[in-house]
Amino acid sequence: CNMRCRYCFYADEMKRREVAISPRMSDVLLDVTVRRVIRSADSAVHFLFQGGEPTLIGLPFFERLVQLEQKYNTRALRITNAVQTNGYDLSDEMIAFFAKEHFLVGVSLDGTAQTHDLMRPDAAGRPTASVVRKTIERLREAGVSVNVLCVVNGEVARRPSEVFDALAPYEYIQFIPCLDGLDGQTRDYSLSGEAYLAFLKETFDRYHLAYTEGRPVSIRHLNNWIAM
């Protein structure tokens, strides 16, 4: 990955492996995977690529993926593709490809610039919020369907209204709680159950207000709870 998020459990796992990073997926394995998944499906297929940072595998990998989907989709199934990216280094060519092939792209942005940069520096320790925000705008300008994923840690939970205001313009948002590691140690960014509940309550109030004012924002788990 080209970022070093403070809460990343993959980074800790890499340090403990004999081989830090496994070899990239071979073309043969990609071919077999796509073929078997499509042949086993009844009506629809969804491929999702996520971190580390999946875009680092390069554009040719995704181009080959789409070629294989077209080759093996002899029953005209509905096939969708999605990528979860940190949004730090997407080329114009990759963005154009995602638009052309109708990829759904999730971008990680932890609320405000302050809360994001506190937790999500690049590999050299530099802030990344401004670059990520620019990437989101580039994706949207290209016509790519985008949603924003925000990790709720202790710092984010203390600023629910600021975080909502920062993310609401992107319209489609997901929140996931930042859990402590299995070692049981708490950290300066740890999220308590009480803090998460308070965050969700105020976020719901803002979500409801935006809806009543004709400015609806989609927050996936709130949508799901309401639909239950």
Go through each PLM region and give its residues.
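Conserved, mostly hydrophobic/aromatic
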Residues: 1, 5, 49, 83, ...
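Canonical Radical SAM [4Fe-4S] cluster-binding loop centered on the CxxxCxxC motif
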Residues: 1-25
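A short, flexible beta-alpha/helix-coil linker loop
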Residues: 12-16, 114, 180-183
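Alpha-helix N-cap and loop-to-helix initiation/capping positions
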Residues: 21-25, 57, 123-127, 191-198
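Radical SAM/AdoMet-radical enzyme domain recognition
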Residues: 30-48, 57-178, 188
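Active-site neighborhood of divalent metal-dependent phosphoester/pyrophosphate hydrolases
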Residues: 52-53
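A C-terminal junction/extension of Radical SAM enzymes
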Residues: 185-228
